[in-house]
Each structure stands twice: as C-alpha cells, then as structure tokens.
Amino acid sequence: MNKILNIIMALFIAICFFGCEKDDICSGGTPTTPRLMIEFREKDNPSILKPVTNLTAVATGMTTGVVFNEGLSSTDPNRYLTSANKIGLPLKITGETTEYTLTQNSTSTNPAIRNEDKIVFNYTTKEIYVSRACGYKTNFDLTGSPVQEPNTVDSNRWISNIVVETPNIVTENEIHIKIYF
C-alpha cells in the first residue's frame, strides 16, 4: 500500500511539474508601437537643428497635451512642455488620421508671440504580433505629406515646411518627419 501511495504521489508531482509553463513577461526592451518622430530645423539653413520654445502638442479630442516630462506631477503644466529639437508623437491605432495642434511659445500671454499650427497626419496601420506576453504592436505607413490646417486665429504660421523623411514608422530610432520653421 505504501508503494502505491508513493507511485501516485510521484506521478502527481511529475504531472504538476511538467504541466507548468515559464512565466510570460514582456521585457522592457521589447519594441512596442512606435511614436512619430519629428525633428525641427532652421528654415533658412536646413542643416541646423532648431529647438522649439515651450512647445505643446495636443491631439484633437485630448484634454491635455502629450507628456514630454514624465518626472513631473500630472498637475504641473511644465509636464506638457518641451523646448527640444526632436519630439515623439503617438498616433491613434484605431483610425487612419491623427490631428495635432502644435503651439510654439505656449506659455506666453502675448498673442503676438504665442503661435499654433494644426497638422493632420494620414496613415495606414498594420498590427504585428510580438509575443504572447507583449501582444501586438502597430506600425504605421504615412500616406502623403502631413496637411497643415488653415490657422483660424491669425494668418501667421510658424511652420514653414513639413518634409516626410521616412514614411514607414516601425521604430523610434529614426526621424520620420522634419519640420522647418
């Protein structure tokens, strides 16, 4: 009787051991849905990178802007500001269009200095299976050049030209669009 009990216990342990799977954990280094990478350049000398002063980027339908300073509190307005020469903007994965309002000098109370331009990005999406733990990511293909909407506040646009460098958005390691101002 003792032998039968030992055999049953050994079989039970073996079944439990071999029935286990390794943990599915999505590594932090796993590529995810890439953002649209934009670089700002001097319009009169295109070889020079140019930082945008106090830029905010707000997608249509959003109540707050894109977070550029994740270390700041969600109540701190500087969380949504950048003065960099490169930014990354997320695109909607549920549609084929995303519209952003890019506001230069957004903290200024002087309307002559504060300037906003609306840009519409048109694209197609492609879902890519990454792994069971990570699920899917979405890649984008820009269709045509981004469109600047007419400025309803005034006729002054701060963006002079928009050039698509890489229409296939599969990684954040390359510049997809250059904006000249």
Predicted regions and their residues:
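Short acidic, gly/pro-rich beta-turn/loop elements at beta-sheet edges
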Residues: 46-48, 67, 112, 131
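Structural motif
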Residues: 39-49
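Solvent-exposed serine/threonine-rich low-complexity stretches and specific carbohydrate-binding patches
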Residues: 65-80
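Extended low-complexity, serine/threonine- and proline-enriched intrinsically disordered segments
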Residues: 49-66
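Extracytoplasmic cysteine-anchoring/structural motifs
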Residues: 21-30, 39, 77-181
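Structural beta-strand segments of beta-rich domains
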Residues: 34-36
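Solvent-exposed strand-loop boundary residues in beta-sheet-rich modules
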Residues: 44, 61-63, 106-108
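Bacterial Sec-dependent N-terminal signal peptides
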Residues: 1-31
